[in-house]
Amino acid sequence: MKKLLKSVLVFAALSSASSLQALPVGNPAEPSLMIDGILWEGFGGDPCDPCTTWVDAISMRMGYYGDFVFDRVLKTDVNKEFQMGAKPTTTTGNAVAPSTLTARENPAYGRHMQDAEMFTNAACMALNIWDRFDVFCTLGASSGYLKGNSASFNLVGLFGNNENQTKVSNGAFVPNMSLDQSVVELYTDTAFAWSVGARAALWECGCATLGASFQYAQSKPKVEELNVLCNAAEFTINKPKGYVGKELPLDLTAGTDAATGTKDASIDYHEWQASLALSYRLNMFTPYIGVKWSRASFDADTIRIAQPKSAETIFDVTTLNPTIAGAGDVKTSAEGQLGDTMQIVSLQLNKMKSRKSCGIAVGTTIVDADKYAVTVETRLIDERAAHVNAQFRF
């Protein structure tokens, strides 16, 4: 049985290096791996000894914490209906644009994100009690990247309007088309990130250790760049701003430098995780395998961001959106000339959450002189991620 356990853990730890958010599982035996310090010797006394004090029981560790998520499995968390203009029904020619909101099927409902990445570098600190329990925290910085179908971001615009561009700008009309054949991606800046947690070695038998941990992490980075890759309305915004809690139609100045009532787009990231893991010590190597249950959310307050445009018309247009049918003829005196151009385009950053809650983690810890340790871990199923942890005991 011991040989089988050794084989399974060693295989899992070694195979993890060949496979490849932001919370690692960690080695369940970590509280008891470093039993000596670089400044003070460890104390292996009996907790029930009346001569033992809490000073003897407590020790500190510090080190580097790096967590790199290459693909977090996320989906949108939105309502089934979305308020926008009625769907066009005219088969030929142009039509009068809708001016009232209608409840339509939300194209963002249940959408899966194509890619979600997060990279964290931090300092970690742990308070150890009796070489069995850890209370720890991390302080550092995170940055991220999100990519998904434009329907996940409710990219909408006005199409087929019988009015010219100047009249559309009066804010009387609402978008009637959902653009779902394109891609939206965003990059965040590097922002402060922190996490707290606790880990305990629950059961030990020889060299095997069964442990559990609980962690919580939070960060709120701003959106650094937003790219909309759409043939009908392609644009890029650096440090985008938008409207929070405002329904369509947007203000007349939306997307211009004169826009008011906007705020910086930021993403509020929260995650909590519970895990159970088993390790087996083999001299200086301690491989482990664990399961985890976590929930993560990315909330941008459903901020709506308008396509950048000119405050004044240039050649009777305010954007460089192409004509779909190639028949656009810009004339101020003639209506319907821009009916085949996408107008008043905007999108919103919807709330996202974990699509899968359960995952597995495999890794190994290398301990040197019972004072220093380096842990390497990879996580699968609910995310593809790698973790590196290097620490020492005082």
Curated annotation (Swiss-Prot):
Cited function: In elementary bodies (EBs, the infectious stage, which is able to survive outside the host cell) provides the structural integrity of the outer envelope through disulfide cross-links with the small cysteine-rich protein and the large cysteine-rich periplasmic protein. It has been described in publications as the Sarkosyl-insoluble COMC (Chlamydia outer membrane complex), and serves as the functional equivalent of peptidoglycan.
Example of a GO MF term: structural molecule activity
Subunit structure: Part of a disulfide cross-linked outer membrane complex (COMC) composed of the major outer membrane porin (MOMP), the small cysteine-rich protein (OmcA) and the large cysteine-rich periplasmic protein (OmcB).
Keywords: Cell outer membrane, Cell shape, Disulfide bond, Ion transport, Membrane, Porin, Signal, Transmembrane, Transmembrane beta strand, Transport
Source species: Chlamydia trachomatis
Cleavable signal peptide: 1-22
Entry annotated with the keyword Signal: yes
Record carries keyword Coiled coil: no
Pfam families: Chlam_OMP (PF01308)
Family: Belongs to the chlamydial porin (CP) (TC 1.B.2) family.
GO biological process, one term: regulation of cell shape
Annotated protein name in UniProt: Major outer membrane porin, serovar B
Disulphide bond pairs: none
Gene: ompA
Entry membrane topology: Multi-pass membrane protein
GO (cellular component) term, any one: cell outer membrane
Coiled coil: none
Localization per record: Cell outer membrane
